[in-house]
Amino acid sequence: DTVWDHAQQLLSWDVQQSYQLGIQWPEPATLHAVGNCLLEFSPSNAYVEDWRQLSHTGPLLGLRLYQVQHLDNGEVFAMDGGLIVAGAHIAYAQSRLPQIQDKLSDFSRLDQALAQHVINEVEIESYEVSVALNGHKIQYSTQSQRVGESIQLTGFELNDQGIITQIRQIHGEDYLCYFQLDLYQPE
């Protein structure tokens, strides 16, 4: 999750699950807008990032994945990830199932868990991050077999409580994925 500290004007991240087994962004950031550019500075000055976003047309949509339900046995698991549509570009991310991620709790690096046969490569790669540029065909993915396939954009449903769901296959089994609309609305 992105965490905004309004009092200190700092942006930080609360990451529960990620592909690697560590905090990728341990330091908060200050943000400065200059025209259509957003500059991110670390308080220690260890890095500066230039988030230059040129104006373009097309949809901008984020769906945040927060849980899945196994359709055969009804078990519900917390998950992380989501679908991002930014104009002609699409990205999908999905964390590992908890029973896989839990195997990694005693490790700081994936290669250590792999070397000790606690987890295999298929389980490591079950954390999906797939990117499609200028269309729906995946060009980059942590799951190499997904390259060339389409990101699944069909089958979304909105129930009476306003919850967005989609049935997806995870490890060859059907899960009902629960999403919430994720967007930023400036004040």
What are these regions (language model features)?
Residues 1, 9-187:
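Lipid interaction determinants
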